[in-house]
A protein has these predicted regions:
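Short, surface-exposed acidic/glycine-rich loop or hinge patches that mediate macromolecular interfaces
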Residues: 75-76, 186, 211
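ATP-dependent adenylation/nucleotidyltransferase module used to activate substrates
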Residues: 1-155, 160-164, 190-198, 249, ...
Length: 270
């Protein structure tokens, strides 16, 4: 979702929670190594600005050395204006890259009017990011997905795709070239939204294409918000569930086979 609910506590409390959650994620899933060069995918939304700002703060005091390479992709969506983002990056200083690839025209040419754009658009954007990381000598790609993104993705796949999957905090790409990390994985969207407002980041519109996938995600986000009003700490509990999978208590025979689970096997005779 583009906006978050009000975050508890003042700006300092929000900042401390975000720093703590980011640090815990980096350590728990071993996201960074000494000497890493990290491409930070900067969309112009509150999440990626927050990610870059927190990593900027962490870098001078971290026990390892790593570089940050902000990278923004202009996908030529209608109504796009990236000038505020570029000015912000110039004021920040240091290396950054803004590149233009007209993926919007590719998607609209290949799909019928009214079709869902997000899947094809995401694949095209992912390929461009992977190639950019390799070309720029980056060893990691950092994305701004947070806790609520992971939970919304879980429910989207459950409700609309019939699959039990979400997004992992870290993964190696299928081609083996890139390691993708999500340092905000433990961060609440409401905290990120509050932090972004306090920092007055120049936010770019988050859904210029008006895709149906984006509307479904907003609907699922509202569902989670409504449920948490009735079930305290629901999202924290759901996130914990993503780290405590019990394959033998599910019904995926292929997964059973890979893990050597055979419920039909009789116990050995005494």
């Amino acid at each position: 979702m583009c906006d978050g609910a009000p975050a508890p506590g003042g700006a300092d409390a929000v900042h401390r929670r975000l720093r703590k959650a980011l640090g815990q994620a980096l350590v728990r899933w071993r996201m960074l190594e000494d000497g890493d060069r990290v491409l930070v995918a900067l969309s112009g939304g509150k999440d990626s600005y927050t990610l870059l700002a927190l990593l900027d703060e962490l870098r001078p005091r971290a026990p390892i050395r790593f570089e940050l390479v902000p990278y923004h992709l202009d996908q030529a969506q209608p109504g796009y204006d990236g000038a505020p983002l570029r000015r912000w990056l110039e004021a920040r200083g240091g290396e950054f890259h803004v590149e233009r690839e007209d993926t919007y025209s590719v998607v609209t040419e290949k799909l019928a009017p009214g079709s869902t754009y997000c899947s094809l658009c995401s694949r095209l954007r992912r390929g461009i990011l992977y190639n950019a990381a390799a070309r720029l000598g980056c060893t990691r790609i950092a994305l701004g997905h947070h806790r609520d993104d992971a939970l919304e993705t879980l429910l989207l796949n459950l409700f609309f795709a019939g699959e039990l999957k979400s997004m992992p905090p870290a993964l190696r790409s299928d081609d083996g070239r890139n390691v993708v990390i999500r340092p905000l994985y433990l961060c609440a969207e409401e905290d990120i939204a509050a932090f972004a407002r306090a920092r007055a980041f120049p936010i770019l519109p988050c859904n210029l294409c008006g895709s149906q996938d984006g509307l479904q995600r907003e609907e699922v986000g509202r569902l989670l918000h409504d449920l948490e009003r009735r079930i305290p700490n629901l999202r924290a509990t759901m996130l914990s569930a993503l780290t405590k999978v019990r394959p033998s208590q599910l019904a995926d025979e292929e997964l059973w086979g890979r893990l050597g689970i055979d419920p039909s096997t009789r116990p050995a005779a005494p």
